[in-house]
Curated annotation (Swiss-Prot):
The keyword Hydrolase does not apply. One of its GO terms (biological process) is cell wall organization. ATP binds at G110, A111, H112, G113, K114, T115, S116. Its EC number is 6.3.2.8. It is found in: Cytoplasm. This is UDP-N-acetylmuramate--L-alanine ligase. One of its GO terms (molecular function) is ATP binding. It comes from Streptococcus equi subsp. zooepidemicus (strain H70). The keyword Protein biosynthesis does not apply. Cell wall formation. It catalyses: UDP-N-acetyl-alpha-D-muramate + L-alanine + ATP = UDP-N-acetyl-alpha-D-muramoyl-L-alanine + ADP + phosphate + H(+).
């Protein structure tokens, strides 16, 4: 008889993906969370997984409990109940560290690009071998006969320390999560500790100065655009249909590839995947074939057209990610005005990276800013406001409210890029409704 898994905080990106994976493996899965809609719950609902309001009545002693990292005895009735009755529970990353031991595991770590790279690696590998995977966009898949397991490896609060994968990619090291990390040295130390746990091979971006200092008992392969790298992407052509490039390993051509994705960062992500699969012994012709059909991951350059208006939704919430997303938009739409609509995520990050955010947003033609989205972990002390960021942006920059997004209509032949990790999608939805109403009124 299969176990029943109960997820405390099932709508979290990693939690929902793990719930789907276990459900597909034949286990009984349920979970609880707040009632507010979150984009991950659609997949859970489609799978028929029950989502309950938080209540200690949801828990019984025969269940295996998995608790989201944000939920503690003092802020969640179910965690409090479990602790009061001495019912064991694991955190997401603790469970995952044990779970992956039954597979050949391939991790993807890094400050930026984890989700897109995990999605790409999962997509290609699942077409060549039975593969289970967890992607940070809330997507999870459990193959009953899986030999391989691909997963996103998160550095926040050093959650990746229970992981000991056979292979891992590290896309980059950058200062983020200032509510936890004390500085770049602290971030580096976390990734360096993780790298020491990789067993067979580590693949790191060679032009990242911090990653060049990483050490590991496993062989380290550098990938990138420079001849000093072990895997080099070259002969690159970026068009409105995607990116074409070749990859060589130690001066020997290993393949020619087309990726239907945009931006320099996605070429790097693909090169990391190619390097990993080459070292793992997979046929590069098959890898090239399956790269062609990659359709992306949720909330990473997700496009839609409303009333002939192009809207892009992206999770970008760090200056490096904003630059990458706007670069991708310019590649696909070189003759259109690029409009950035950005919501800063957390007061601590906004304070720490205020000048960097302003610099990144200057890559757009016009900028609109939503009020800062505070984390549940922090209190707004009034130290920073979104108007402070608007004042530093050199491009035309305005602050908008979710109730009035009409200033966005002041542009012709434009692409609207909504970016953020908070509730920026509410602003996007308001804009979509405004466009739809304009269509009705013009009929």
């Amino acid at each position: 008889m299969s176990k029943t898994y109960h997820f405390i905080g099932i709508k979290g990106a990693g939690m929902s993906a793990l719930a789907l994976l276990l459900h597909q493996m034949g286990h009984k899965v349920q979970g609880s969370d707040v009632e507010k809609y979150y984009f991950t719950q659609r997949g859970l609902e489609q799978a028929g997984i029950t989502i309950l309001p938080f209540s200690e009545d949801n828990i019984s002693p025969d269940m295996e409990l998995i608790a989201g990292n944000a939920f503690r005895e003092d802020n969640n009735s179910e965690v409090a109940y479990a602790m009061r009755h001495q019912l064991p529970f694991k955190r997401y990353h603790e469970f995952l560290g044990e779970f992956m031991k039954q597979f050949t595991s391939l991790g993807v770590a890094g400050a930026h690009g984890k989700t897109s790279t995990t999605g790409l690696l999962s997509h290609v590998l699942k077409h060549m071998a039975a593969t289970s995977y967890l992607i940070g966009d809330g997507t999870g898949h459990g193959a009953a006969d899986a030999r391989y397991f691909v997963f996103e490896s998160d550095e926040y609060e050093r959650h990746f320390m229970p992981y000991h994968p056979e292979y891992s990619i590290i896309t980059n090291i950058d200062f983020d999560h200032p509510d936890y990390f004390t500085g770049l040295d602290d971030v580096f130390n976390a990734f360096n500790d993780y790298a020491k746990q990789v067993k067979k091979a580590l693949f790191v971006y060679g032009e990242d100065e911090e990653l060049r200092k990483i050490s590991s008992p496993a062989p380290i392969y550098y990938y990138g655009f420079e001849d000093t790298d072990d895997f080099v992407a070259f002969d690159i052509t970026r068009t409105t249909n995607g990116s074409d490039f070749k990859v060589r390993h130690h001066h020997k051509l290993i393949g020619q590839f087309h990726l239907p994705a945009y931006g320099r960062h996605n070429i790097l992500n693909a090169t990391a995947v190619i390097a990993n699969l080459f070292i793992a012994g997979f046929d590069m012709k098959l890898v090239a074939e399956h790269l062609k059909s990659f359709s992306g991951v949720k909330r990473r350059f997700t496009e839609k057209v409303i009333n002939d208006t192009i809207i892009i939704d992206d999770f970008a919430h760090h200056p490096t990610e904003i630059i990458a997303t706007l670069d991708a938009a310019r590649q696909k739409y070189p003759n259109k005005e690029i409009i950035a609509i950005f919501q800063p995520h957390t007061f601590t990050r906004t304070i720490a990276l205020l000048d960097d955010f302003a610099h990144a947003l200057n890559e757009a033609d016009s900028v609109y800013l939503a009020p800062i989205y505070g984390s549940a972990r922090e209190i707004d002390k009034g130290d920073v406001k979104v108007e402070d960021l608007a004042a530093k942006v050199e491009r035309p920059a305005k602050v908008i409210s979710v109730d009035n997004v009409s200033p966005l209509l002041d542009h012709d032949n434009a692409v609207y890029v909504f970016m953020g990790a908070g509730d920026i999608q509410l602003y996007e939805r308001s804009f979509e409704e405004l466009l739809a109403n304009l269509t009705k009124n013009n009929q």
